[in-house]
Amino acid sequence: SKKIKFEGIFTHFYKTDNENITNKQINIFKDYINIIEKDFYPIIHIGGSKMVNYNVDFAKYVRCGISLYGYGEKSLKPVMKIESKVIKVFEIGKGENVGYQNGFIADKKMKIALIPLGYADGIPRNLSNNFKVKICGKNVKSIGYICMDLFMVDVSNKNLQIGDKVCVFDNANEWAKKVNITNYEILTNLNNSRTNLLID
């Protein structure tokens, strides 16, 4: 119809890790473009970050998504990390529990540090007792269930003090693998209203 003017056309791909499937989709999309371009020359927008690996030079735009975070391709490096600070250091004795529901019970005297981030900030709760952070360049293990606004780490035999910097997160793939979800879910669940994201 001459009353319809195409300003643009776009598509999305459902399995960009599979070249055969994706190339078939690209060819179908190109067929539609050839029909439309007989009358119009629309803006052509195609797929997301991984489309840079395909022959799509007929498109005007590619939507960069997760690649902006430094993920999706092996040649990219993560550009984001989350840092916090130690807000409290205290000792517990053998048999004492840490956090809700007896999520961790000490088998010896231990020194514990509190970090003021929790699942409200996007740390998956099923990482409880199953991830490490860096304090003063040393890896320390989380203990107990992650709380809404806090988590705890074992800093026994570590010389640290309140205010020391904590690197909580610098690679979404590590967390995603541990809890069997995608790095997309880790990244989009981070709560930037409470968390300052540091971009290298």
Protein language model features and the residues they cover:
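Active-site loop/helix belt of alpha/beta enzymes
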Residues: S1-G93, N157
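C-terminal accessory subdomain/extension
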Residues: E91-D200
